Each structure stands twice: as structure tokens, then as C-alpha cells.
Amino acid sequence: MALATAAVHIYLGVITHVMVVTQPDATAAAGGAAALGFFAALFYLDGLGYIVLIVALYHPAFARFRRLTRWALIALTAATIVAYFALIQGQYDAIGIGDKIAEVVLIVLLIMEGRRDRRPAEAPITE
């Protein structure tokens, strides 16, 4: 889920950047190059944030930070959802809504995984 949403945000960054470079009329109508360049940067940073946190969450070298990393990934995901609805201004699209659904599922899965990791390991059965 996290890799999928990272890919979506990097894709949106590329599409937005290409629009700024190749479609000056559409860029002007959408708020100008500065505004769209800012959004492209946000998309890139969001995608990169997901990738970095996924690596940190599952790489054995960072195992001692797993709980903190999981909460950071949950916070990034929640912030992404809030930012989408705050900035989209009612102009919803299938990619955005589909990605928000994936992000909600990601949060649920991360919480479930965190609860599972907190449970003590079952003692082996000896006879």
C-alpha cells in the first residue's frame, strides 16, 4: 500500500512538472508556474517520504526505531489525506479518491501491525 501511494505521488509530481514545462496556457489557468511547481515539489517530497519511511520501518538496521517509524508513517499518511481534502477544493478525481482509500487502508494495516508487534511472543509448547 505504501509503495503504491508513493508511486502515485511521484507520478503526480512528474505529471505536474511536465505540465509546467510543456503547457504554459494550462499552467497559467491552473494557478501559474510557481504554484504548480510548488505542488510538484510537494508530490515528490511526499512520495520520497513514503519510500524513506518504508525502508526505515522494515530494514533490520532500524528495528529499534520501528515503533517510532510506524507512527511517523501513519502521521505522514494522515497529513497527506488532510492536505488532499484541504487543497483539492472539491475537484475530486478517481486517482485522488482511490489513493485516499489506499492511504486509509495503509493506516489501518499499520495500526494492526503495531498491535501485533506489541503482543508478547507465545511460549513454545514443550512436552
Task: Name each model-derived stretch.
Residues M1-E127:
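Membrane-interface extramembranous regions
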